[in-house]
Design a protein with these regions (language model features):
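Sec-dependent N-terminal signal peptides
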Residues: 4-13
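Beta-rich carbohydrate-recognition modules and glycan-binding surfaces
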Residues: 17-184
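Positively charged n-region of N-terminal signal peptides that target proteins for export
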Residues: 1-4, 21
Length: 184
């Protein structure tokens, strides 16, 4: 009985959702397949940055490469199509990662939409952290511009997600991801 009262107290005062559910979007140990990732770097507009997606021996996803500012470049990204999942009611996306101190974006795309919906997060150098990105923080962006008059993100229409770096800092980058989850 004492445990039940403690749980209710914590739930009420610390807003722990009693019906919180998570849905794995990326869990590299589930054999997501490297060949399913698409790389889109600034070479599409004349830049020379490069990136790759790998799976390390711990079965974590590695997004790494080199950002070059040459030819007005400065970004690298990766994208994975996701199978139709029920994302209705999602409150936030959770990423467990170890980074290099750079800023990154989680990008969500909807079918037949030019823009993607992005949310920024900062990694910490050589330290595992969990970042939570609320759905309402995702903004429609295209080619580096944010749009205020674009339709709202519709979770049931998401068909891909990706990782993106565009902080205009030349040099190597390395992001290790254990998982990306959608949390209700």
């Amino acid at each position: 009985m004492k445990k039940l009262i403690t749980f209710i107290f914590i739930s009420l005062f610390f807003e722990v959702p009693m019906n919180s559910q998570s849905l794995d979007l990326i869990n590299p140990s589930n054999e997501i397949g490297i060949k399913n990732w698409t790389i889109i770097n600034d070479d599409v507009m004349g830049g020379v940055s490069n990136s790759a997606v790998l799976i390390n021996n711990k079965k974590n996803l590695i997004f790494k490469g080199y950002i070059s500012l040459e030819n007005n470049g400065g970004f690298a990204s990766s994208r994975l199509e996701i199978r139709k999942k029920n994302l209705d009611g999602i409150r936030f996306f959770e990423i467990k990662l170890k980074g290099d101190g750079n800023n990154y974006k989680l990008r969500l795309r909807q079918k037949n939409m030019r823009a993607s919906y992005s949310c920024d997060f900062k990694s910490q150098k050589n330290k595992w952290i969990i970042v939570k990105l609320p759905v309402e923080d995702f903004r429609p962006t295209w080619r580096g511009y944010t749009y205020s008059n674009y339709p709202r993100l519709e979770l049931d229409k998401i068909n891909s997600l990706g990782l993106h770096i565009s902080d205009k800092q030349e040099g190597k980058f390395n992001l290790e991801v254990e998982y990306i989850k959608a949390v209700k």
